[in-house]
């Protein structure tokens, strides 16, 4: 038996530049429009934050988890440069959902999804609050990986090649810097959470992100947490939900 909206979640598809993107919309109890979080996974997206979606739903939030073009069942070729457009398409989809309060849409991004949240929010005023954890705000460091490492860590899961991916990384690193985007988010609330044991994105980058952001930025370091907060998920969930409740619903 497949879950339906009455059971708290439903499958969704929506269009982005002619490509059909797939996702799951977790729906809080009640028919009235609810505040909603857009969840952005990283690259390739092994950690999909399903636990956070359930926690948000249990606390009265809707949550949409979707997949960018070219990964995890979404159509098209994977391209870092088009991910912000996919995020905008997801916002368009949410804004048309009757059980979504279009005036209370937030975004939560992890790793590369944190970068996507930052660069999209800089030009997308419909995002009322922005939260990131383990954010790869500056993707330049990834460009130094070998082609074999890129294939092993990323492209074997994606509809692209190591060579194409390297070109995308270089272009994004030069033209779409998440650290630079952070200042444009002000005065909207921004939450930056980072683990001190993150081996993919050094905590120094998160501290620089805090410096670049405006006074509405809330910065939290979690001692011993790794890139995916593997052993700190409950703490992460409570932190994010509590902050969102304050930032969006007051």
Which residues does each predicted region cover?
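Short amphipathic alpha-helix adjacent to the substrate-entry channel of hydrolases
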Residues: 48-65
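Conserved alpha/beta-hydrolase "acid-adjacent" motif
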Residues: 199-205
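Active-site glycine-rich loops that stabilize anionic/oxyanionic intermediates
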Residues: 34, 41-45, 196
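Catalytic nucleophile-loop/oxyanion-hole region of alpha/beta-hydrolase
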Residues: 44, 53, 69-102
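Catalytic histidine-centered segment of alpha/beta-hydrolase-like enzymes
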Residues: 225-235
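N-terminal cap/lid segment of alpha/beta-hydrolase-fold proteins
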Residues: 1-31
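Short beta-strand/loop motif that positions the catalytic acidic residue
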Residues: 185-186, 192-194, 198
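Hydrolase active-site cap/lid region
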Residues: 119-170, 188
